[in-house]
Design a protein with these regions (language model features):
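C-terminal low-complexity, acidic/polar tails when present
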Residues: 29, 49-55, 114-115, 564-609, ...
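Extracellular beta-strand/beta-solenoid scaffold signature
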Residues: 84-90, 109-115, 140-147, 166-174, ...
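Surface-exposed loop/turn motifs in large extracellular/passenger domains
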Residues: 94-104, 118-137, 149-163, 174-191, ...
Length: 938
């Protein structure tokens, strides 16, 4: 694989050491700053400085100069203080020992700089301290800096106690056999290198960079161990200590490189194009190159190595990255291991209970070379969503320290098959999906946070801790649940298998299902062993409309001893002491099957012989379990029909057959009616029973439209009515109530014949407003709208038996139709009125006794009567739809009625009347009605 370019890195290895050419073996003598110097060529391209004449004063600091001082071989001389502008190149330790110290705010400025230049040259430049005003000691090299330039040279640069150095570039150990050392130490101590591609630590020789105690280096591209045979070492140590290259870092380019990030230090790469632009770290770049990087801390402070692009461990050479206790390595994109076929890459993630190394990356990618990844207590942390987080790793052993995965709020997938006997831990928010067959991993797995989704096989025991989740469609070992287990895939339904025992220790189970019949799709937890403890189960209905079950929907399968309890945690209501969940028209309870010990969601009555107090008669055999709103909705339709029934003529206006003869006598009337009912339908889906208390007020006017002197007349009328009722509903599925307000109008037309014949026709329109409640589920519907209309015709004839006594046979036919507006109840079930029609015939006979009298000059008339009726219903009652499930109700077809009443009239204008009726269906239902009214003519 082609290596990334070094651009200008090679341009600065060697520069002419003086102002004269040394391209041949010729010698030249010249005067440099008062020193006679001969340039003598030992071999082409390499100068040697020979001092021919100089005075000792040339090397001594100026009198009184305390901030810039030099000793030994420092060129050019003399050293100026406190601010020395060299005007050319600076050499400290050309061929002998030399030191230059810049302290207490002093400054030096030069072109190029050589510290430890030629063979035998030992140079030390120390930059330290600040002045009294806080101004740092400063060294500025406009060109490159070579520390340990030629073979046999040894150079040292020390930047201490807040000193600041700046240069174009830097090379430590430029030639084979040279040694270059840089120490940047102390808060505020800085070395800034301006060129993007030129910072070599061990170019051909040995280079060492040490940054500690808060020192910082800002450089271009960093290369540690550039050429073959070179050796580079970089140690960045201590909190606030930092190396921040504006380009890539190469550790072991062609030579040997080592980078240590320790005790809270920071090393970070980013490109110069913009802040945060990508730059990578290469460890073991080319064939023959060997790089080692270790990130760790013993102080508790986190050491950080970060690349704004990739970390490459073994590009074509040999690379090793170790992230140990207290270390954090970050690859903004990916971490590659052993990329080229010639490479060897080793990634060590180490740690223990006292601290763990962390590699934060988008993914770890296995290359074509020799790959070694040691998961030994360190943490792999994701920094993006990634479906193939361990890319290319078909198998992976887990070392003694264990594998630790931190999804860090991301969605991460791993298809690797793990093996080992230690531990596997899921950390952090987010989801880790394991799809490989890790049956060979027999150690303990802990889900400490976030979600572990197992779609493959994970051997060994599993512990789900509080706040964590285990999900998936695969297989795990014996499981302890302190958190949440949610079988199934991300979408759809599926089963998670626990190959072993299950122990509930405060955890819960989440199940998604499509609530319907026995074959409904559902998530399921399969336990091959035994169960212990109590587990709350939260069931989420995914689009299920409800249906009657037989055996039920199996959600927990237990193959072993089923001693554990699974209890529905999110029931919509409680029935018979069991929480129940509503889907459409049905309620579902979670039950253990007495045969197989597994757990099922069932929409069936579990104890049909034990209805709720006050409930209606349940079905003879266990039937469906309807949700608590259904009996109320059934009763709602029946109540509307009962409240829409039409009265008889005599109930409405009393007995007008005895009004004074003659046309022109119009009238007005008002009546109040009250009733109490107990209705036990002959046909009822829910076995509900209703108790209705009703009050109604009706006011009307009559006008004689035609009349004869013989007493026959045609009377037209119009009445308005208003009423309120309270319905109490009882059912094995749950009790409830309905509060109804109604109003309407009734036009009438009545013919009274002179021979005792009458014919009465009436029509009625009513509008309803109802509030529906369930005792188990609370409010079902407020302000439910409904309407009805009805027609009735009644006819009869009075036959005189003797003076004042008459027998009145009569018959009536009424038709009523009711409908309510459809609505969605609190559970989301659609409730619709399907039909609500009644066609009732009544045949009866009344015995009427009348007496006339006069008192105080006022005519008075009174009559009392009794009536006996037989009623028959010809239609089938009401039918509603609850989530497309038909719910029907019909009262008994045949009823008997007994009524008594009285009229009292005076002054030929006024009358009061009343009637009490009792209706019964001979099977327990009854209605008692009382009405009282006042009528006047004018």
């Amino acid at each position: 694989m082609k290596s990334p370019p070094l651009s200008r890195a090679g341009k600065y290895l060697f520069k002419k050491r003086c102002r004269v050419s040394y391209c041949s073996h010729a010698a030249r003598i010249y005067l440099r700053r008062g020193i006679v110097v001969e340039e003598h060529r030992h071999r082409a391209g390499w100068p040697k400085w020979i001092i021919l004449a100089a005075s000792a004063a040339s090397f001594a600091p100026l009198a009184g100069a305390q901030t810039v001082s030099g000793t030994g071989d420092v060129q050019p001389g003399p050293v100026a203080s406190p601010d020395w502008v060299v005007g050319g190149d600076l050499i400290v330790g050309d061929a002998a020992a030399g030191t230059l110290t810049i302290s207490n705010g002093g400054s030096v400025r030069n072109d190029w700089a050589f510290i430890g230049n030629l063979n035998g040259g030992v140079g030390t430049l120390t930059l330290t301290g600040v002045d009294g005003s806080g101004n740092a000691s400063r060294w500025t090299s406009l060109g490159p800096v070579y520390i340990g330039a030629d073979p046999g040279s040894d150079g040292t640069l020390r930047i201490l106690n807040g000193g600041v150095a700046q240069s174009e570039s830097g090379t430590l150990g430029a030639s084979a056999g040279s040694v270059g050392t840089v120490v940047v130490s102390g808060p505020g101590s800085n070395w800034n290198l301006n060129t993007v591609n030129a910072f070599l630590i061990g170019s051909d020789g040995k280079g060492t960079l040490q940054i500690d105690n808060g020192g910082a280096v800002r450089s271009g591209q960093g290369v540690i161990g550039w050429n073959a045979g070179s050796e580079g070492h970089v140690t960045v140590s201590g909190s606030a200590s930092a190396w921040n290259p504006f380009n890539n870092i190469y550790v072991g380019f062609n030579g040997t490189g080592e980078l240590l990030v320790q005790d809270g230090a920071t090393v970070h790469t980013e490109a110069t194009t913009s802040p945060g632009a990508p730059a990578s770290i290469y460890i073991g770049q080319n064939a023959g190159g060997a790089g080692t990087v270790t990130v760790s801390s013993t102080t508790g402070a986190i050491s950080t190595l970060s690349a704004s692009d990739r970390i490459n461990v073994g590009w074509a050479g040999t690379g090793a990255l170790t992230v140990a206790k207290g270390g954090l390595a970050i690859a903004a994109t990916d971490t590659w291991v052993a990329i080229d076929g010639t490479s060897t890459g080793t990634l060590n993630l180490n740690g223990d209970a006292s601290g763990r190394g962390v590699l934060e990356t988008g993914s770890v990618i296995k290359g074509a070379g020799n790959v070694n990844v040691n998961l030994d207590g360190g943490i792999l942390r994701a920094n993006r969503d990634e479906a193939n987080f361990l890319n290319g790793f078909a198998t992976q052993a887990v070392a003694a320290g264990g594998a630790w995965f931190d999804t860090n709020g991301r969605e991460v997938g791993v298809s690797t098959a793990f093996s080992g006997t230690s531990v596997f831990n899921k950390l952090g928010a987010g989801r880790l999906t394991l799809s490989g067959n890790s049956a060979a991993f027999t150690g303990n797995t802990e889900v400490q946070a976030g979600t572990l989704q197992v779609d493959g096989v994970l051997g060994g025991p599993v512990a789900v801790l509080a706040g964590a989740r285990l999900t998936g469609t695969g297989r795990v070992g014996a499981t302890t649940n302190k958190g949440t287990i949610a079988p199934g895939p991300r979408s759809g339904f599926g089963a998670l298998t626990i190959a072993g025992d299950y122990a509930a220790q405060g955890g819960n189970l989440e199940i998604r299902t499509r609530l319907g019949g026995d074959d409904s799709p559902t998530d399921k937890l399969v336990i091959t062993g035994a169960t212990t403890g109590s587990t709350p189960v939260t069931v989420t209905n995914i689009g299920g409309a409800g249906a009657q079950t037989q055996r039920g929907i199996q959600v927990v399968q237990v193959n072993g001893l089923s001693a554990g309890q699974f209890n529905l945690a999110n029931g919509d209501y409680v029935i018979g002491g069991r929480p129940a969940l509503v889907a459409g028209a049905y309620g579902y309870v979670l039950q253990q099957d007495s045969g197989d010990g597994s757990w099922y969601l069932r929409s069936a009555l579990t104890d049909p012989g034990s209805p709720q107090t006050g409930g209606g008669s349940p079905p003879a055999t266990p039937g469906p379990l309807y949700q608590p709103g259904v009996p109320v909705y059934e009763a709602y339709a029946n109540t509307l029909m009962q409240l829409s029934k039409l009265p008889t003529l005599r109930q409405r206006v009393g007995d007008r057959r005895y009004d004074p003869q003659g046309a022109g006598r119009n009238g007005a009337w008002a009546r109040m009616e009250g009733s109490t009912s107990r209705l036990d339908p002959a046909v009822s889906t829910t076995g509900q029973r209703q108790d209705i208390d009703d009050w109604k007020m009706q006011i009307g006017v009559d006008r004689i439209l035609a009349g004869q002197q013989d007493g026959s007349r045609l009377v037209g009328g119009l009445a308005l009515h208003y009423g309120i009722s309270d319905t109490r509903v009882s059912s094995v599925y749950g009790n409830g109530s309905i509060d109804t307000t109604r109003y309407g109008l009734t036009p009438t037309l009545t013919w009274y014949g002179s021979d005792g014949v009458y014919v009465d026709a009436q029509a009625q329109a009513t509008w309803f407003d109802s509030d529906l409640k369930s005792r188990l589920a609370g409010k079902l519907k407020d302000g439910g709208k409904a309407s009805s209309y009805g027609f009735g015709i009644e006819a009869g004839k009075a036959y005189g038996l003797r003076e004042g006594l008459a027998l009145v046979p009569q018959a009536q036919v009424t038709y009523v139709s009711t409908r309510f507006d459809r609505f969605n109840d609190r559970f989301g079930a659609r409730v619709e009125s399907d039909k609500g029609d009644s066609l009732q015939g009544r045949f009866g006979v009344a015995l009427d006794y009348r007496s006339n009298g006069q008192g105080a000059g006022v005519d008075r008339q009174s009559n009392v009567y009794g009536v006996l009726n037989l009623k028959h219903e010809f239609l089938d009652g009401s039918r509603i739809q609850v989530a497309d499930v038909p719910i029907v109700s019909r009262m008994s077809r045949t009823w008997g009625n007994l009524g008594v009443g009285a009229d009292y009239a005076w002054a030929k204008r006024y009358a009061v009347y009343g009637q009490v009726d009792a209706d019964a269906d001979f099977s327990g239902s009854y209605v008692v009605t009382g009405t009282v009214g006042f009528r006047m003519t004018f």
